């Protein structure tokens, strides 16, 4: 069975978050190998969105606020420790944020627009 395959577009903010995760693990835990594994695991989870981008939860509904004025924002838990927020635009999944799941990300978005 053929599935439609979506393109994944990483925002500079998400790339920066991946870099910070890698640096933190490599420096604070002193393990480059653990840092590589964690980033690879996150990217593997993100790649699932190529086949089924609707898998994530409705962020706009959960937050009670539309984060993107033009598209529905969705969220997906990654590697147990992170959440990626994204929109689906035609055949592209646009990754907007990569956040620690233990952070108070809901509070962050109560006052901040995606375009800030």
Regions found by a protein language model. Give the residues of each.
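Arg/Lys-rich, positively charged N-terminal/basic patches that mediate binding to nucleic acids
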Residues: 1-45
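Generic structural signal for secondary-structure transition and capping sites
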Residues: 30, 47, 51-54, 81, ...
